[in-house]
Amino acid sequence: MEKLKEIEKESIFPKGEEKLLTEKGHPYRERNKGIIALLITTIIWSLAFIAQSTAMDQIGPCAFVFYRHLLSGLCLLPFAFLKPCSSEEKRAGIKGGALTGIVLGLASVIQQFGVKETTVGKAAFLTVLYIILIPIFGLIIGKKPEKKIWFCAILALVGVYFIAIKAGTKFTIGRGDMYIILCSLLYAIQIMQVGHYVKKVNISWYMSIQFLAGSMVGLLGFLFFEKFSFMSLKAAFLPIAYAGIMSGAVAFTMQSYAQKRLEDTLASLLMSTTAIYAAIWGWLFLGESLGIREIFGCIIMTIAVVYAQLPEKQRKRS
C-alpha cells in the first residue's frame, strides 16, 4: 500500500517536488486546485490589458499607474499589520519592497505608454519576453543558463520581428512596441528582485510596500506631466478598480496559493498563457485584430516561451 502511494506521488510530481504535497487532501485534488487557481490568475492578468487600454481614453498613463498600485498596496497593507513578524523581517520587507517597487513603477508607466500606442495583443505578447530575458540577465550576474536559452532567445526575437515589424518596411519598430520591449526588460529585473528578496523578508510587508512604492513613481509623473481631473478619474474608476484590486491584490495572492501546489515548470507554462488570453480579449472587446504575419509571430514566440521553460529531463523523456 505504501509503495502504491509512492508511485502515485511520483506520477504527479517530479522527483524533489514531493514537498508540494499538502498535509491534508488528496494530491490530485490539491494539484488541480493549484491549476485552476493559476488559470484564473492568468485570465485576471490578461483582462488587465483591456483595463489598461480603456483607461487611457480617460486618464494619463502616470495617473493610472498611481491609482492602480496605490489601491493594490492599500488592499494588502492590512495583512502586513495582522501577520506578526520580527522587526528585522519588517525592515527587510520594507527596504526590499521599496527597491522592487521603483522598478515595478517604472515598468508599469512605460507599459502604459506602450499600451496607448499599440494593440492589446501585441502588448501582451511582447511583455512575455521577460521570461526569455531573465536567464540572460542571470548570465550577466554569473548564473550560466542552459544552452537551449540562447536558441529560445533568437527564436523569440524572430517572433518579435513578425509581430512588431510591418511587412514591406525596413527594420523599424513602432514607438509603442519599443515601450513594451523596454517594459519587459524592467519586468525581468523586477522578477529577479522578487526572487532575491522573497526568501529573506516578510512577504506581506514586501508586497504591500512594493505596490505603494510603485504608486509613488506614477505619482511623480502624474504631478509633473499630467493634470488631475475628477471627472476623468470617475470615468476611469472601473478599469482602475479592476487593475488595482483584481490584477494586483487578488491575482498576486492567488499566484502564491497556486505555486504552493504546483511544480515550477507547470506554473510557468500556465502563466505564459496570459498573452494568449489578452489577444483574445482584445479581439472580442476592443475590435482589435492580428494579421496573418502577426499571428505567425505570436505562434513562434509562444513556442520559444514554452520551450524555454521545459526542463532538460522532461524533453528527453518525450
Task: State what each model feature region is.
Residues E2-K3, E8, P14-K15, K19-E23, ...:
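C-terminal-most transmembrane helix of multi-pass membrane proteins
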Residues N32-A37, A63-P78, K95, K148-L155, ...:
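Hydrophobic alpha-helical transmembrane segments of multi-pass integral membrane proteins
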Residues Y67, V109, A123-L129, V194-S215, ...:
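Helix-helix packing/entry segments at the starts of transmembrane helices
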